[in-house]
Amino acid sequence: QGFVFDPRDETFQLTGGGGQHGMSMDDWGRTYVCANSEPFSLVMYDSRYLVRNPFLQAPPPAVNVAPAGKFTRLFRTSTVEPWRALRTRLRSQGIVPGSDEGGSPSGFFTGATGVTVYRGDAFPAEYSANLFVGDVSNNLIHRALAVAGGLLVTARSAETGREFVASSDNYFRPVQMANGPDGCLWVIDMYRELIEGAAFLPPSILKHMDVGSGVDRGRIWRIMPAGKRPSLPRLSKSKTVELVALLEHPNGWHRDTASRLLYERQDPSAIGPLRQIATRSSTPLGRTHALYALAGLKALGPDDILAALADPESRVREHALRLAEPFCHDDARVQSRMEAMVGDPDPLVRYQLAFSLGVLPGTRAAGPLAALAIKDGADAWCRIAILSSISGCAGDMFRQLAGNRAFRASLPGRTFLAMLAAQATAIRPADVDVVLVAIDGPLADDQPAARAIVAELMDKVTSETRTRLAGTGGGRARAILAELLDEARATAADEKKPPKIRAAAVRALRFASFVTEREPLAALLASRQPGEVQAAAVDTLASYSDAAVAGVLLAAWPGMSPKMRASAAEAIFGRPVWIGAFLDAVESGSVGRSDVEPSRLNLLKSYPDLAVRTRAAKIFSSGLARRQDVVAAYQKALERKGDRERGRAVFEKNCSSCHRLENVGQRVGAELSAIRDRGLEAVLLNILDPNREVMPQFLSYVLVTTSGRVLTGMISAETANSLTIKKPDGSAENVLRLDIEELRSTGQSYMPEGLEKQIDVAAMADLLAYLNSVK
């Protein structure tokens, strides 16, 4: 996540769309961030809008807009660094283990940093609004064009066969950039010999390197067109009226700095000139900056807003909507004008309108939001914007759209209507009556829409609302639910149907009771059933809370494949009462101790339920050896010649639940595609002592829901309203924050200690041989 800092009272708050190192806004305030392998990501919404509807689950706001992402072609001109050449020579001579290739692959993004939108005036016009990002590993700066398309942009490489800047100096590390006061692009060069993490160098080489080489040589570069020597302004000496005039300057630094100084001075003499620019400036950016400056002086009024909402430039109208929000409660003229903007020709204006309508009082937003749903509801981002604004009017909006036959006749319309029904009843449970009336009324002759709504409600609403729908008060919805379940049972049992279709039907059975579905689901766990169907049966059983669920899963355990056992264990470990049955099975021998993966042992050590922790400690009392002793004992694996094919089998059995190589396994843990370049000593250390150095994104968390379920995994994504937990079986689950009872880090890597219990020295040599062979 990102954060917003207020220098007035030294407070800050979290916001959406954080990156790793680098954040920049274009002239109109659209925010870009970057990460090591994601050079350009566009932030699509402000989290302050999302939190108004705590039931809304949305994707992370930062979206990769580079078509090739990490694999965008880069044209490096620097040679392989000396330490890489040394490592290659030592490997080829057999002095150190590992690949004899010269360092990690180059030519694509592995260290993207410092994303910056060019907003200066020193470069030729075609550079305006270009995107720049450094790649420290490749010693270059990449330039891209931001090509507009609907709500998103596409970052397309601007150069052909070359880079904007490519240095032959291996120490050149462009970590950050800025638009300078002279209109040029300024670059912070960290200037270091070593930029990689320690894990990517064998310890035997690392100990001979000066990891601080270059620490005293950092520098700032200024990139300017040949023949130009721009001067540096001193705006701190400018008069207030001069600062106001600078809001129309073609250089973004001048506009931003003038805006800041006007805010700092709080000079009331600026109000008149600002109002002149806000209404009469020939530049849309000047008009927009003037509006914000008036707001900063607490001088912005409804008349200013009304004029801006009618501005001929769409970007001015977009910002006027944001500035109008404080006036929406009291000024009927502003309210009416905003409502009339549902027909605005610009999609970005309507997108902002969908967010801003949420501040209208009472149920007044229902009509314009319904109109936007009809016009833009097929777009996923517009749906998020609309649904963020429905907290005060969801039921009224549903009533209007349910009566619109043309809207619900389309698949996007039915989909939106179903989502709205679930949101409305979650926000205000009494609105289930609105939905039931619609199903019995305008939707009585619209079977597709009614079925979509009932299915969505059963999937998303509370157990109390589900009971209401399935009970005598459910009316026609009850009959529809019965039809859906009958169809699902028939499809799930039909072995002639494709596995994917059957699996979807099996998952629909979670709407029924465990008592009625116990036997059919148990039958679907049989080993002769397709894997997809078995997995769906496990998921459906996990959705129930009955104590007997664990018995059904454990009865099928002997015939389950390793992958299916991982899924079953994930389900069983979700509730303390089920873990009790699992521990019974371990004690009785029906589940072997070797079947319990190290990751599960890690979870048991930190399980929220004390009784579970205590009992597990007794059952698995052998404990784990000291890490340094294990690492020392396994050094023999580095000296042995391993077998690649046997190593592949070791990987598939012990590692594939969290890692993926050569189309085998799950993408849960760290990416292993370039693991051979770390050196086998480092790889062995990572396997046997995973907690020696843990990156934050690979920490293990335990999450307890308000319904008593326990999830364990890594936090793979988060928004203002929800967290996404990536689980050991490779699946991911999105959990609303309001459904979280407890969330805590275990302080441990998600990769467990204790793999030596499954992998002996000979098998480790085979595994290392396999990992070292993967290209």
Task: List where the protein language model places each region.
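C-type cytochrome heme c attachment motif
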Residues: 113-114, 184, 219, 273, ...
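A short, compositionally biased micro-patch
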Residues: 26, 134, 180, 706, ...
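Beta-propeller domains with acidic blade repeats across secreted/periplasmic ectodomains
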Residues: 1-242, 253-254, 261-263, 663-664, ...
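Gly/Ser/Thr/Pro-enriched helix-cap/hinge segments flanking short amphipathic alpha-helices
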Residues: 260, 288, 687, 703, ...
